[in-house]
């Protein structure tokens, strides 16, 4: 029995797509094929896929909703798991529990509907709840670490564990999940009671700021670089004269130099080449070495 036949038998009922192009699913609109793209409907299907992959020695990874990543043009071998169907969100008092695939922006809107404060900072951050925990996503002075109460994960060995914020060892755009290989299943956020109108006004203010400053009209991978201590990446790039700098179909945004946008059918290689070139030119200009925030995954073509 071939691996494909065994997969279809053991993982019957699970949505699996073979040799699926990933550019359709990424915010950058680039990326080659996944050998097996999987859409589990619940944590049990996810656990079945991970168990099968481990037993068959097939590599696997979870992409969240592919908002802060670049998939290389050669694609990704093995299983790529998208969790956007694991998207239930519930509210219990001042606590919101969200599955990993829940949309982060929509989760902040649910907090607003229940007049819960603390989540406003994330009202414009694209991505999934699971991805936000993985990266300790943040903006405008807030971050996931400030509101996370606990997190349920599937370990790389297929066990389910509940972790505290302390267990996750949050840092700037970092969590322990990045090293552990675990997969976020669901998250509990501890919020506080607030006034609906006040929360809405703050979310509207932050959304307006984001629309003014960020090139939301183009495909992009979000913030490309981490914030250097004492500096802003976008400012350093701008001071090096790199706004509008372009390689292939990808360019440094004129609107916000911390973003790289796909303006003309760019490729993952265009992104990688532009990122490396910007790092080198900023280093030459300011002496500061920028560090990538965006993850680059897969194989070159």
Swiss-Prot record:
InterPro entries: FAD-bd_PCMH, FAD-bd_PCMH-like_sf, FAD-bd_PCMH_sub1, FAD-bd_PCMH_sub2, MurB, MurB_C, MurB_C_sf, Oxid_FAD_bind_N. GO terms for molecular function: FAD binding; UDP-N-acetylmuramate dehydrogenase activity. Pfam families: FAD_binding_4 (PF01565), MurB_C (PF02873). It is found in: Cytoplasm. Disulfide bonds: none annotated. Pathway: Cell wall biogenesis; peptidoglycan biosynthesis. GO terms for biological process: cell division; cell wall organization; peptidoglycan biosynthetic process; regulation of cell shape. The active site is at residues 173, 223, 293. NCBIfam families: murB, PRK13905.1. Cell wall formation. Belongs to the MurB family. This is UDP-N-acetylenolpyruvoylglucosamine reductase. Its cofactor is FAD. Residues 30-194 form the FAD-binding PCMH-type domain. Its main location: cytoplasm. The keyword GTP-binding does not apply. Keywords: Cell cycle, Cell division, Cell shape, Cell wall biogenesis/degradation, Cytoplasm, FAD, Flavoprotein, NADP, Oxidoreductase, Peptidoglycan synthesis. It catalyses: UDP-N-acetyl-alpha-D-muramate + NADP(+) = UDP-N-acetyl-3-O-(1-carboxyvinyl)-alpha-D-glucosamine + NADPH + H(+). GO terms for cellular component: cytosol. The gene is murB. It is an enzyme of class 1 (oxidoreductase). Its EC number is 1.3.1.98.
């Amino acid at each position: 029995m071939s691996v494909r036949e065994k997969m279809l038998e053991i993982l019957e009922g699970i949505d699996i797509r073979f040799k699926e192009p990933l550019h359709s699913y990424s915010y950058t609109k680039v990326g080659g094929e996944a050998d097996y793209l999987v859409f589990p409907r619940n944590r049990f299907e996810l656990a079945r896929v991970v168990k099968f992959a481990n037993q068959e020695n097939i590599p696997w990874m979870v992409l969240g909703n592919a908002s802060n990543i670049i998939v290389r043009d050669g694609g990704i071998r093995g299983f790529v798991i998208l969790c956007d169907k694991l998207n239930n969100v519930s509210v219990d008092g001042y606590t919101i529990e969200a599955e990993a695939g829940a949309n982060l922006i929509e989760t902040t809107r649910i907090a607003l509907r229940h007049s819960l404060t603390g989540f406003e900072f994330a009202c414009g951050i694209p991505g999934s709840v699971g991805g936000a925990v993985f990266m300790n996503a943040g903006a405008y002075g807030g971050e996931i670490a400030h509101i996370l109460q606990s997190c349920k994960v599937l370990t790389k060995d297929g066990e389910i564990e509940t972790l505290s914020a302390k267990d996750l060892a949050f840092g700037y755009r970092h969590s322990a999940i990045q090293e552990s290989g675990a997969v976020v299943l669901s998250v509990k956020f501890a919020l506080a009671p607030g006034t609906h109108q006040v929360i809405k006004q703050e979310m509207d203010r932050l959304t307006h700021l984001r629309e003014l400053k960020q090139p939301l009209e183009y495909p992009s991978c979000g913030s490309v670089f981490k914030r250097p201590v004492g500096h802003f990446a976008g400012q350093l790039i701008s001071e090096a004269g790199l706004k509008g700098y372009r390689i292939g179909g990808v360019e440094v945004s004129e609107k916000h130099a911390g973003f790289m946008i796909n303006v003309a059918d760019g490729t993952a290689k265009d992104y990688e080449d532009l990122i490396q070139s910007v790092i080198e030119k900023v280093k030459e200009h300011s002496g500061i070495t920028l560090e990538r925030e965006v993850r680059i995954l897969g194989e070159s073509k």
